[in-house]
Amino acid sequence: MKKRTYLSAGLALLIGTLSVHASPGLSDVKSRVLPAVYKSKNGLTQKVEISVKHEGEPSTVTIRLGEQSRKEKLVSGDNVFRIEIPEVSTTRQLPLTLTSGKEKEETMVTVKPVRHWQMNMVQHTHTDIGYTRSQMEILAEHLRYIDYALDYCDATDNYPDFAKFRWTCEIAWAVSEYLKCRPAEQIARLKQRVKEGRIELATMYLNFDELPDEQTLAASLYPIKQFRENGMRAEVAMQDDVNGIGWCFSEYFADAGVKYVNMGTHGHRALICFDKPTVFWWESPSGKKVLTYRAEHYNQGNFFGIHTDDFEQFEERVLAYLDQMEAKNYPYDILACLLYTSDAADEEDS
């Protein structure tokens, strides 16, 4: 009997300590407790990933983990299976047995409680005047994106609530222009979706760097009044692709009724501060406060591959990210994941 210990690069992978009987058929058995709670017909569950190398001809294997048991097909080479177990509230040691013909592998798997993560996917169209094209050239496209968002809301009205399409208008410029030029029917559709919470209006006119002065930044918030005169709620500011935000906004936002700030950082030519998302009360010199979330990159969802239609890859990357958050002692169980298209994308793909 040979005892092996497998370590993961992420501290929260919870790899089990394995006692493996050497055999020509089954070998290199590993276990991994996934860092998430799943909803299923059996209630809340956790999943244990079992990987095993099979050196013989294709056959079947019986996997027993605790009280759960099932048969799977074995192929020559590497095999990966996921076993669903009831959610645990305390750390438990579960026996794992793999049986294929006369071959048998046994070990213990440590299953620890995991967080009830909530990851909010924030879909938006990133606005990058100058990097893409001039504002006169791209305005028509940004107005069209709002039309598309309204159509997608209509198309998913009969979906379960968690699956209904939702959209965030990253900056106020395009929405302000939309209210000036679109037909009354379209404006009414937008108002209704904002009222329902299906479309969120952000309040910053653009993603500003350090060049504008305080008077310019104060004047840039005029669309907030325009939105509210049209009966549309606007309580969040988004600052994407520019690391940091003008200090004067801490005063302006509070006075204008903006309650939240979300910052999607940029790490290509600038340093991303801190090693994980942060939440804090941004306090102005006069003592006014706005709740601020410093998120990851403003297209983090694209890094996860959500736009590729490869859900298995997307899930694996999200799980790896949750492992990282555990390892970095992220203190909350809610995360925001920003995702977008249009920034340098082909028009037909936007």
Task: Give a label for each model feature.
Residues 1-2, 346:
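Generic N-terminal leader/processing signal
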Residues 2-9:
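Bacterial N-terminal signal peptides that target proteins for export
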Residues 9-17:
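Bacterial N-terminal signal peptides
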Residues 14, 346-347:
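Short stretches within intrinsically disordered, low-complexity N-terminal or propeptide regions
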Residues 19-21:
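Sec/Tat signal peptide C-region and signal peptidase I cleavage site
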Residues 24-343, 350:
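Catalytic-domain carbohydrate-binding cleft regions of carbohydrate-active enzymes
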